[in-house]
């Protein structure tokens, strides 16, 4: 039998008013800073390790593709780019919609909401995958319509068809990662990713070399590796009993009340895709330059470089999103604010470090990827600009994590739209083609976008009303339709918001 605990909205407001009368110190103590830094590190470090392992696995796939043949490498690269734009970025963005729901639910002590959000998100991603698969089935026709080489388009079609199982696997993998991270469980994620990558190497040799499946084997090996990650993750969590505090057996409830998940997932997806796609647009613009092969190759090297550097702020962004969500769900707005302050401070240090790295290796970095002198010179010219971009990219990425933890993905999406497409794109096109800055003009456009994005994101973080966000978190976790009754009381004719929240708590 479940009995309801009634939490008065008036009492909640009174508690927050009391906090305002006795506010936390403006400057946190050294002990508080150290404690929060440890909390962020415990979440971010395993995430960084997992991301670096995934980066290595991607490099292994490209290495096998390159050894098969130049045409196969081109077809596989085209398929991977199309899959990233239309599939993987979409699923990753949609899955982030569950991030604030899970982290705030965990902080609020709502275990059933955690597992239901996981189940609903998996179903939502599988449903979305049906639409994506329909698009992938027509990749060859789409590429020929866009005047791509028929031979490369045919190979790309074959490669992406072999990637469909991987798309479905990602519909489980992304939600599982967020579900566990919201509870502070990160070690299984790193171990599972490592196991999948170790398995990836012999699987490539077996499918590509032993069975002779060529570049189709590379795609199948990637799908098999991700499937192993999911199996390993589920098995580890289940055997260790890590699921027990929050798991609810799937029922008809997971087919209902999708509103909060979808409402947060769509703007999260838009925000991720707007930024992700901008880099693909830069590659397309390179193809319009004189002698495009050199700038396109250099752009590929630089995007790989910025992807490597992005691992660190993105992992910190995921960590602070979880921390902010947990603290808001627990009705501790001051601790959520502290987490944001510490994370953004770390992001500034990350930006300086990444910038120094880009400047320091500018003359030698290109040699790691190619012996072509023209490509190396172009890469060396753009790397210092890339370094300046990181000064904005690191803070804005972590700031986006803070905003995501407060369940405001629409805010982040609007900022990305304005910064990358209303500022960055005009600057890039204008400098590249009208002012004749060429290849470096594209990167100056990215610099303008990153500066604008960082400024707006940090302004949003700095002006956040944390007490208000704590109330929003209570509403989000208490009005989701799960074992909750909401009673509204009309006062002076005003029915603008609920005045009483009734949360049921299981009792023996």
From Swiss-Prot:
Keyword rRNA processing recorded: no
GO molecular function terms listed in the Swiss-Prot or TrEMBL record: antiporter activity; xenobiotic transmembrane transporter activity
Keywords: Endosome, Membrane, Transmembrane, Transmembrane helix, Transport
Taxonomy, superkingdom: Eukaryota
CDD domains from the UniProt entry: MATE_eukaryotic
InterPro entries referenced in this protein's UniProt entry, alphabetically: MATE_euk, MATE_fam
Membrane protein topology class: Multi-pass membrane protein
CC terms in the record's Gene Ontology section: late endosome; late endosome membrane
tRNA-binding as UniProt keyword: no
Subcellular location: Late endosome membrane
Family from the record: Belongs to the multi antimicrobial extrusion (MATE) (TC 2.A.66.1) family.
Note: Overexpression of DTX52 alters shoot developmental programs leading to a loss of apical dominance phenotype.
Protein name in UniProt: Protein DETOXIFICATION 52
């Amino acid at each position: 039998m479940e009995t309801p605990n009634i939490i008065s909205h008036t009492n909640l407001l009174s508690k927050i008013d009391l906090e305002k009368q006795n506010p936390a110190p403006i400057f946190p103590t050294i002990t508080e800073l150290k404690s929060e830094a440890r909390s962020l590190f415990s979440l971010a470090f395993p995430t960084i390790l997992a991301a670096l392992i995934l980066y290595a696995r991607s490099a292994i796939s490209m290495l096998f593709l390159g050894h098969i043949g130049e045409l196969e490498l081109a077809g596989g690269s085209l398929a991977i780019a199309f899959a990233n734009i239309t599939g993987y970025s979409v699923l990753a963005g949609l899955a982030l919609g569950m991030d604030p729901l899970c982290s705030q639910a965990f902080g609020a002590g709502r275990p059933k909401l955690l597992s239901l959000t996981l189940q609903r998100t998996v179903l939502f991603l599988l449903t979305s995958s049906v639409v994506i698969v329909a698009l992938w089935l027509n990749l060859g026709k789409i590429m020929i319509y866009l005047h791509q080489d028929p031979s490369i388009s045919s190979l790309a079609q074959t490669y992406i068809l072999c990637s469909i199982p991987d798309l479905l696997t990602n519909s489980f993998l992304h939600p599982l990662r967020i579900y566990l991270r919201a509870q502070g469980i990160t070690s299984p994620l790193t171990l599972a990713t490592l196991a999948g990558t170790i398995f990836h190497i012999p699987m490539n040799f077996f499918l590509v070399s032993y069975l002779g499946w060529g570049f189709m084997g590379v795609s199948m090996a990637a799908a098999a590796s991700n499937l192993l990650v999911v199996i390993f993750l589920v098995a580890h969590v289940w055997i260790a009993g890590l699921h027990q505090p929050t798991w609810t057996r799937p029922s008809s409830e997971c087919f209902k009340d999708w509103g909060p998940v979808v409402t947060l997932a769509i703007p999260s997806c838009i925000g991720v895709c707007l930024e992700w796609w901008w880099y693909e647009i830069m590659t397309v613009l390179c193809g319009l330059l004189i002698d495009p092969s050199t700038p396109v190759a250099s752009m590929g090297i630089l995007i790989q470089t910025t992807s490597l550097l992005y691992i660190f702020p993105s992992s910190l962004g995921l960590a602070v999103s979880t921390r902010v969500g947990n603290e808001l769900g627990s009705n501790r707005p001051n601790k959520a604010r502290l987490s944001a302050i510490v994370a953004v401070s770390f992001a500034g240090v990350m930006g300086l470090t990444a910038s120094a790295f880009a400047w320091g290796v500018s003359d030698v970095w290109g040699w790691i990827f190619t012996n072509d002198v023209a490509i190396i010179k172009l890469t060396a010219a753009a790397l210092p600009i890339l370094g300046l971009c990181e000064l904005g990219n690191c803070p804005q990425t972590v700031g986006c994590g803070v905003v995501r933890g407060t369940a405001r993905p629409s805010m982040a999406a609007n900022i990305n739209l304005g910064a990358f497409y209303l500022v960055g794109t005009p600057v890039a096109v204008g400098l590249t083609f009208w002012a004749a800055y060429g290849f470096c003009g594209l990167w100056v456009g990215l610099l303008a976008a990153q500066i604008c994005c960082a400024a707006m994101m940090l302004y949003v973080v700095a002006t956040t009303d944390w007490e208000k966000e704590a109330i929003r978190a209570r509403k989000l976790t208490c009005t989701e339709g799960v074992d909750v009754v909401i009673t509204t009381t009309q006062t002076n004719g005003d029915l603008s918001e609920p005045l009483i929240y009734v949360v049921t708590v299981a009792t023996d």
